[in-house]
């Protein structure tokens, strides 16, 4: 994944660990987008430069358009694609997709049960996958099955407290400065129900922010009282803006993002626009929301 989150990394690492317990030679394709938080779960399985795979598996990736540059040669060579996004494009030779799962980690756990015994080494990254993709088990797509999966992983003796502390209760001072600046410049529309928070490159440069500092900034907007449609737009390059949309029941996030060439889940989705200014990008997102939400007003 071009911007690997905890679910992508945790699923890949957990499956890789399981395959190794079966005597398989399994590695993860190196990924330059790892953060300080996710890298420790990935690095032990990173493939050497001369490794040539016989089989290729992808986890938690909805489309080959999300492959990083070093993965693009495998775009038409994926033997098995495992995902839980409704917008999944079934690009693998074989595909396992379960949109009702809150996290792809739930699917990987089901697969692991059929392959081998669950060990702490397998369980820890899968707990990272499920906990992070559910925002600490608070999102609306979390089910009783999600909690049962987490309990099964916890029963192996993993240090789940450390995971929760790292991902949900720890912020750098730079991260807090970023959030304060985003909130100070936030724009509100639709009777204050829609918030747009922007992260231009100049803001990251101002605070000397790393990718770890900027990880999951989309979680900030939904915390604003009265907001049920939170747009986070981040500048990735000249004229390139990435949107993360987090919504309540009134707004179908994936339908909005599909209008902009993206996708995801009903309550969390994303899209990327190229060749646009910040104002143009924001306008296109607001127009897309208005097309999906009948009562939306700028």
Feature roles, as predicted:
Residues 2, 8-37, 49-54, 134-297:
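Hydrophobic helix-and-loop "lid/oligomerization" segment in the mid-to-C-terminal part
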Residues 18, 72-80, 114, 144-145:
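A glycine- and small-aliphatic-rich helix-loop capping segment at beta-alpha/alpha-beta transitions
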Residues 29, 82, 96-97, 197:
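Hydrophobic residues at beta-strand termini and immediately following loops
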Residues 39-94:
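Active-site cofactor/cluster-binding pocket
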Residues 49-50, 71-74, 88-89, 118-119, ...:
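Solvent-exposed alpha-helices and their adjacent loops that cap or buttress functional pockets
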Residues 65-67, 105, 253:
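Short, well-ordered alpha-helical microsegments
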